[in-house]
Amino acid sequence: MKIRRDDQVIVISGKERGKKGKVLRTIPARERVIVEGLNMVKRHTKPTPQGDQGGVIEREAAIHVSNVMLVDPKDGRATRIASVTEDGKRYRVAKRSGTRLD
């Protein structure tokens, strides 16, 4: 997956289209990401014997990686990601501006 934790992304499809957020977690096995403050769902939880209170909590749900794009650090618009090898190390580069991301 080209998107990594702490990347700034924009949602390009679905009910949250056009919104930006930071990637909190990636799930490579399912090709999904969890973006801070986006795709919120309500979970009904039971109280646990350890003392956790039950109730309805709202939290972020996963979004498929094909529905998000990286935000270019230079102009704040969506960009694709290229992989470039320099001196034996691989880096991610924003295709829109050529800015190195790592």
Where are these regions (language model features)?
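Ribosome large-subunit tunnel/peptidyl-transferase-proximal elements
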Residues: 1-46, 56-60, 69-77, 83-102
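A cytosolic small-molecule/anion-sensing beta-strand core signal
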Residues: 66
